[in-house]
Amino acid sequence: MKGILKDIFQLNLPAKAALNAFTASLAKSLKESAGDSNVVGFKSIVCYRTGLNVAIVSCTASLESSLVDLFKTYKEEGRLRLAHKALNDLVVRIAVELASEHDIPGKSYQFILKLPQISKCFIIE
């Protein structure tokens, strides 16, 4: 995920475009990994950072603000740490959506299978 963010930050996109690129790139990466026979499951630490109370939807302004803050920290300190609840919840929602769309035998999703099915309302257009 950090690689995706670094690639996007190199493009110096406006916040909305960067958020759309992040969402699309993360979903694509997870989908590709789900089909890889060498990948046995997915695990993320995002819930350890902001908790298991994952919001079903986040407002675009909050997501964009979190991404801008993350970008500033990356430019100033050269490090990326996803500790913004709105972004972390988005990551979990993307993974949940992927898990619900693709019944992939043998793949496990830690924390994800216990979450209720949600709509695609989180996708940023």
Predicted segments with their positions:
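Hydrophobic faces of well-ordered beta-strands that scaffold small-molecule active sites
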Residues: M1, V40-S44, G106-S108
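Long, mid-chain structured domain cores
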Residues: M1-A24, L30-S33
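Active-site gating loops and adjacent loop-to-helix segments of metal-dependent hydrolytic enzymes
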Residues: M1-L11, A55-R81
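Alpha-helix N-cap and loop-to-helix initiation/capping positions
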Residues: P14-A21, S25, S62, A83-L87, ...
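Short amphipathic alpha-helices and their capping/turn segments at secondary-structure boundaries
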Residues: T23-V40, I94-L98
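Extended, H/D-rich, highly charged conserved domains that either
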Residues: E32, C47, L52-V54, S100
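Catalytic pocket-lining loop regions of alpha/beta-barrel enzymes
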Residues: G51, S65-E125
